[in-house]
Amino acid sequence: MNEDAPMDLVDDRFADQSIQDEPVDDGESFYNEDVYVDCEEDEDDDVVPTSENFRLENRYKPSLHTPRELPTIREENREDVRSNTSSRVNTRPPSVLSDKSNDISNMFGFQDGGRAIDQYTDQFYSEGNRAERLFPEAGFLQNSPVRDKQNSWEPSVCHYEKQPTPEVKNNSPGLVFANMSSKKDVTRKQENVRPGKMMPEKVNDENEPKSRRFSPERNTFTTSPMNSTKYLEEKTSTPKRPGGTNRLGTRGLPSFECSTIYDISPQRTSGTPKTYESRHPTNAYTPNSATTSDTVLSNRTIGDNTVQNVLKGVDINLLTALENARKKRDRPQVKPDFRLNSLPRGKLSSTQRPKSDDHSSMTSIVSSSTQNNTGYRKIQEQRNSATSTDLTNSNTSNFTNNTSRVSTAKNDFSRSSRQRNGFSDSSVSTIIPNMNSMTTRDRDGRDSVSSVRTISRASSTMTVGGGNGHMTSGAPKPLRFHVSRLGFGYVPIGETLTMQLEVENTTDRPCKVNARLDSKITCFKVLDNATTMIDPKKAIKVRVAFTPTSLGRYSLYLKAEVAEQNFTQKIPVWGWGGVSKIAPISARNLQPTSNSSEFAMFVSDMKRIAFKLGNSGDRSGFALLTVYDSAMRQVPNSYVRFNPSNGIVIGKNYEKLIEIRIDPSYHDHYGELTNNRTSSAMSTVSTASSMASLRRRVIAGSDFFVQVAWGVEGIRERLRMLEMKHKRRQMIDGLDFTSHPFTDEKCVVYPPPDAYPTISDEDHDLFAASYSNFYINIFSSPDGLNAFRAATVSADKFDNDATVLETSAFRHQTFVNDVTMVPRHTKLM
């Protein structure tokens, strides 16, 4: 229908129809007969003002609640009502609008209607009205007993205005549908008008077509057009109030804007209702807009063209957008995770491990086989270096302290230089500066007759060095550990082995470190203070002692905690109780000497050398035999044969017969060297071979001697597994313990169980620190044997400390200071 059609034509069309909309006689009704004006009978008369005796405390009480008993148009009759819309069109002269006598706000003592608007708005958004403001037709406001469709002052069906959508600005809140603006917003809009542009005047004329006329009451509960287009039709309601006012007597209820969708009213200066905030997450798509915490949905602004196309039925994109918005509203909001390193890292690969200058090249993992072989050769060169410069620059020198221990125990002859059995607490150790020390190629060499090196692995303090502990997270750690674990290896039952763990403070402030063990096992003990302070960029050493009480495996964790920084580092600590003890069985032709690592044997026929080796320890052990001549040259394999082999495995409490046959042509090939021996004093010692050669000059003696390197078979099996892991030969002090089979060894070795320590480069160093040596001197004449015995007794009687030996006791180096004095009586030839 054309809205500009003459009203008489409308009256002719619907003359026979009318609506009985007289007010109900109710004491609580808002309808007032005295002030009601029938505009159809007398259109020119002014509205009769309300009596002066009409007060706020009397019958009319603006309680901000809608009346209950006023009749409204029911849902089932709205089709009939639509046909009678034109019969209720009322026209009022402009004089009535200009007459301020009907301004109900002045009657109630209000200066303006703003306070009533604010009261109504606050009541509408109060905590008690937890209504669904997104779609009011399905919300709590329409279904409550006070505001249901049967007892509501509001229209039974809400209208959707056909007014043009205001311009959407860039700074407008993101996509709101119920943006309520008060007089403050209107004032703000007027201030934003350009100076040269006139503000259009808004005239409240009831003769204006309803499609363009502003209706505050209907706009308050405007319904979304997403369900159907029937809401665009005009609806009738209960009788109008005088003067076009609302139930509070004011004209300026909050206006309705279509610029945005789903936004809470900006009039709200107080907090948003909790239920409203929980249903509507914060806008995440328009963070730079004017949307504050009141933004309820994360949608983009819908343009004017899209809205017009939807209203005209051309496009349904808006319907789809509204449906998606409704689905997103029910979707739970993902909470941000502010934890550091929320994704745990796995173990670093071999190529990603952190590097360090003081990290031992022996413990570094090389990716390619070519680099492995090159690195191995470099290690051997550094180990065999003969100068003090090489010693200072070598990686292995970092494992020794600036001071070394020199044992002065005179009566402790039960231990060999590498033997841990027979350790006594009566040993006296003295700290001396390590000044002009030289490195040696051989780990043990052969000890002096006049001095017994009593520094064994079980009786010494070990300084553990090596690579950094693996970093499991990207966050910097306040402490830096030079090893990832403490491996004590095999320790004799009842003996004590002490190791030092270096801990460095990497921060710029002091750290209070608490070191403790996570188990109550008495075998392990932290010797230092449990709590200590570490200065910035400084390091301390934590001593841990291991004393096994029975045969078995022990493992626990050493925890280093920095409570102020909530940091805890665990260092695995493990060790075995019980060792093997291999030694030659004394016979008539084989006798021990005052040095526990030296034995003398008389053999009339050098073609066959036979002796027995026995294992009196608690575990199976291995023995590797090597034959040297009097000039400390190793006899080639083509001139010597071993029966059963040069490598054997001996079980505990078991003996094995060893036969060595030397080809007589060996002397013809290399010449007789016994007449070339000298008694010159030692001025510089650089290698184990030269040191042994010096002792051969000092101690007149043997034609050959046999070096027996022995240890626990379990630690050699770990070395074999390390060799299979890296696929390269593991040489220990120039000796090969793994490339050839040993007699009675296991044919196949398997990786250790999960509860056991994993195979790592530390096993190489652990093996080098744990195996021991002893020597059997072979004499072809009784005179040589007697001279050897006399030299041994004289050296022990006159010069017990003739040679001062220093060792790190855990790593690869043996140092000899240039203080050796050669007794004059040792020269026999």
From Swiss-Prot:
Gene Ontology annotations for the cellular component aspect, listed alphabetically: centriole; cytoplasm; pericentriolar material
Key words, A-Z: Cell cycle, Coiled coil, Cytoplasm, Cytoskeleton, Developmental protein
Any one Pfam family match given in the protein's UniProt record, by short name: Cep192_D4
Any one GO BP annotation for this protein: embryo development ending in birth or egg hatching
Regions of compositional bias (Polar residues) in chain numbering: 83-93, 217-230, 266-294, 409-439, 448-463
Source species, domain of life: Eukaryota
Region (Disordered): 1-29, 41-104, 183-294, 326-471
Statement: the UniProt record of this protein carries the keyword Transcription regulation: no
Protein name in UniProt: Spindle-defective protein 2
Organism for this UniProt entry: Caenorhabditis briggsae
